[in-house]
């Protein structure tokens, strides 16, 4: 059966009312804002009541560089939560919520798969509780207010050529990357070049995911730099005097969403920045709540350890106030063979030699996560085409690095298929973690970037081209150089070239621009040809989707 067929079959008979799931966490119905029987948001009063509660253990799930189809990181995260519950623990899962772009495009949703899913799967993958729509509305409201300011006299002296703020849409639409607005004469606005980002790449998504409460949300929104004046001074949302209006639109979106797995493990799904063009982690509020309500919180960071993993460590943990007690790196035989040079069409054929070549990619990610001083476990997400020889090679190769590697079959078997991973994680949690920061936040921007390139990617140098050098001068001039850096880079490679696979060394990362995101609290470093508005593939997943006359959805994976 497909993911949606499994979800539909189980939702009808086994899904608990969300009030029952919440009761298992010690929450009453008064702590919830219900969205039907299966979804709820936590109220601000419930969040405030938890603020002094101690944290449990934190497990971060990340991965190697993936194939275009993804390697099942969310599936492993869900399955691990279910497996830990079977071991008598009280885990709480914290995931990002899906963007419609990948849902309608190629990669799929973010609810796991098979018998390791969060439900209601259709709702979560589509409109859920409306968070993405609220974010899109807030982004576009701010854009409209900026253009209205230009039209109504421009008292802030904003230079239309230097506006940074873009509009947003939660779908892949390459035709909107570069647009001209304000056409049609004097009553239709000030003509200027503009563009659209996908909603999850907008700074407001990062702000939502890093904000600790309404006051912090407003402070972060107010700091957002929307552009520059004619004399090149930064203009913020606070300067426009619309901080309160934008925060108002995001009031409910700030509250974490509570759902459940097919095995009733509680899961907070909240916020969804991409890891290749943003910081790739779910909200601080959701992760913090999971830490306070369970004895083990399991969360994931987008794409590989070079992207979401690094950003979780260097951007999210300082705000969260908690570092991981263990890291799980998800690997698949097919992705390692892909990194070893095997074509996509041949990945189901046994090839231990290519697997050995591709193993260097996993080795690089293991070393990068170990450099933070945290115990590492490798979870091999097993597919039916994997052979015993290939699996044994991976287990033995990891053992030579003193890393425990175990297989998982959670897609087919649910939590039962993740018990080996759960046991390895529990053993890792018994080891001491001595967290070490990758770089000093007070170091200069170039030093921070080069440190990531050398210590995480395995590269040698950084080349600054295009707008990057003038952007650096602006950052230093305005005193923003102490912010952490958020690398925008292809997810398919450790380099900035998606076609360079494996674990190359001695390469140069090409930085074309550095964009200050003062609300989020980091500097986005644009490398290679990465885009903040993706395009749909030649054969979008949307072509296989439908809804019957009685409202039953099909084709959603």
From Swiss-Prot:
Domain of life: Bacteria
Protein's GO biological process: tetrahydrofolate interconversion
CDD domains, per database record: FTHFS
A Pfam family the protein falls into: FTHFS
Pathway: One-carbon metabolism; tetrahydrofolate interconversion
Chain sites annotated for binding ATP: 67-74
Single GO MF annotation: ATP binding
Record keywords, A-Z: ATP-binding, Ligase, Nucleotide-binding, One-carbon metabolism
Record InterPro entries: Formate_THF_ligase, Formate_THF_ligase_CS, P-loop_NTPase
Catalytic activity: (6S)-5,6,7,8-tetrahydrofolate + formate + ATP = (6R)-10-formyltetrahydrofolate + ADP + phosphate
E.C. numbers: 6.3.4.3
Family: Belongs to the formate--tetrahydrofolate ligase family.
Protein name: Formate--tetrahydrofolate ligase
Source organism of the structure: Lacticaseibacillus paracasei (strain ATCC 334 / BCRC 17002 / CCUG 31169 / CIP 107868 / KCTC 3260 / NRRL B-441)
Gene: fhs
């Amino acid at each position: 059966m497909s993911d949606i067929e499994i979800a539909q079959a189980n939702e009808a008979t086994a899904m608990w009312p969300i009030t029952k799931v919440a009761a298992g966490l010690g929450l009453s119905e008064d702590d919830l804002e219900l969205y039907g029987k299966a979804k709820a948001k936590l109220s601000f009063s419930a969040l405030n009541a938890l603020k002094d509660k101690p944290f449990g253990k934190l497990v971060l799930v990340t991965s190697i560089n993936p194939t275009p189809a993804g390697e099942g990181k969310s599936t492993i995260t869900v399955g691990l939560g279910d497996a830990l519950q079977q071991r008598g623990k009280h885990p709480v899962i914290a995931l990002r919520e899906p963007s419609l772009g990948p849902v309608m495009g190629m990669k799929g949703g973010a609810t796991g798969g098979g018998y390791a899913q969060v439900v209601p799967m259709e709702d979560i993958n589509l409109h859920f509780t409306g968070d993405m729509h609220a974010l899109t509305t807030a982004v576009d409201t701010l854009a409209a207010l900026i253009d209205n300011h230009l039209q109504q006299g421009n008292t802030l002296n904003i230079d239309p050529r230097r506006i940074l703020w873009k509009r947003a849409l939660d779908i892949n639409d390459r035709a909107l990357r570069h647009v001209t607005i304000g056409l049609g004469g004097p009553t239709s606005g000030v003509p200027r070049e503009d563009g659209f980002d996908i909603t999850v790449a907008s700074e407001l998504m990062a702000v939502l995911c890093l904000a600790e409460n309404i006051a912090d949300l407003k402070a972060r929104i107010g700091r957002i730099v929307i552009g520059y004046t004619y004399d090149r001074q930064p203009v913020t949302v606070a300067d426009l005097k619309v901080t309160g209006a934008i925060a108002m639109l995001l009031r409910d979106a700030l509250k974490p969403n509570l759902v459940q797995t097919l095995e009733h493990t509680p899961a907070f799904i909240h916020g969804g920045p991409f890891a290749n063009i943003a910081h790739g982690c779910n909200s601080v509020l959701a992760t913090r709540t999971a830490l306070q309500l369970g004895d083990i919180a399991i969360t994931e960071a987008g794409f590989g350890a070079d992207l979401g993993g690094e950003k979780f460590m260097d951007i999210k943990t300082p705000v969260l106030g908690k570092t991981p007690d263990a890291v799980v790196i998800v690997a698949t035989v097919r992705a390692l063979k892909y990194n070893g040079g095997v074509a996509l069409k041949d990945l189901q054929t046994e090839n231990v030699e290519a697997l050995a070549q591709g193993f260097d990619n996993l080795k690089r990610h293991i070393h990068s996560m170990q450099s933070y001083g945290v115990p590492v476990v490798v979870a091999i997400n097993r597919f039916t085409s994997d052979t015993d020889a290939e699996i044994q090679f991976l287990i033995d190769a990891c053992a030579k690095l003193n890393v425990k590697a175990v297989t998982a079959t959670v897609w087919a078997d649910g939590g039962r298929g993740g018990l080996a991973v759960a046991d390895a994680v529990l053993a890792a949690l018994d080891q001491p973690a001595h967290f070490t920061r990758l770089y000093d936040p007070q170091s200069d921007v170039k030093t921070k970037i080069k440190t990531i390139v050398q210590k995480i990617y395995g590269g040698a140098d950084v080349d600054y081209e295009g707008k990057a050098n003038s952007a650096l001068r602006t950052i230093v001039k305005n005193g923003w150089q102490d912010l952490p850096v958020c690398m925008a880079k292809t997810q398919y490679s450790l380099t900035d070239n998606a076609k360079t696979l494996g674990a190359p060394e001695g390469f140069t990362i090409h930085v074309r621009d550095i964009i200050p995101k003062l609300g989020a609290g980091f500097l986005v470093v644009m490398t290679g040809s990465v885009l903040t508005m993706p395009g749909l593939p030649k054969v979008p997943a949307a072509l296989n989707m439908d809804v019957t006359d009685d409202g039953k959805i099909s084709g959603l994976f």
